[in-house]
Amino acid sequence: MSLYLCVFVSGVESYGVDAGAYSDFNRLRHYIAQHLEDGKPGFRFPNLILHSDCEGEWRPEDCAALRDELARIIEAMCERPATDFPPGWQVALAQSLHLAPRNAMESFIDVDGEPLLVGLLGLAETAIQAGEPILFQ
């Protein structure tokens, strides 16, 4: 099952990110917990790591903290070495788009081959500006 995250403004989708399968999103969260939180999930980034992907949304009042966490995560992951894409659609997409991650941040992509964390940051910024939630669909 695919995880699509989006922000609607006045009933129209304003920004969306297809993260791939729930397992792909959880792979990102697992990496962050292991490498940036010393194996203590939610210790440094509770809004991203501890939020259930079944809860349906990040509320507007949570999006500023989420944005700040994502900015710190992006900065830290840009300093870490790249990891391999998991077998399957990500490897195939990376080959077709000639993607060669230079760091860990670029090693986690959405279904368009864009860095997933950058897309999530864009969602948080859009949600803050619009005062709307980020929806899990």
Give the ranges of each region predicted by the language model.
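Acidic (Asp/Glu-rich) sequence patches and key acidic residues
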Residues: 1-137
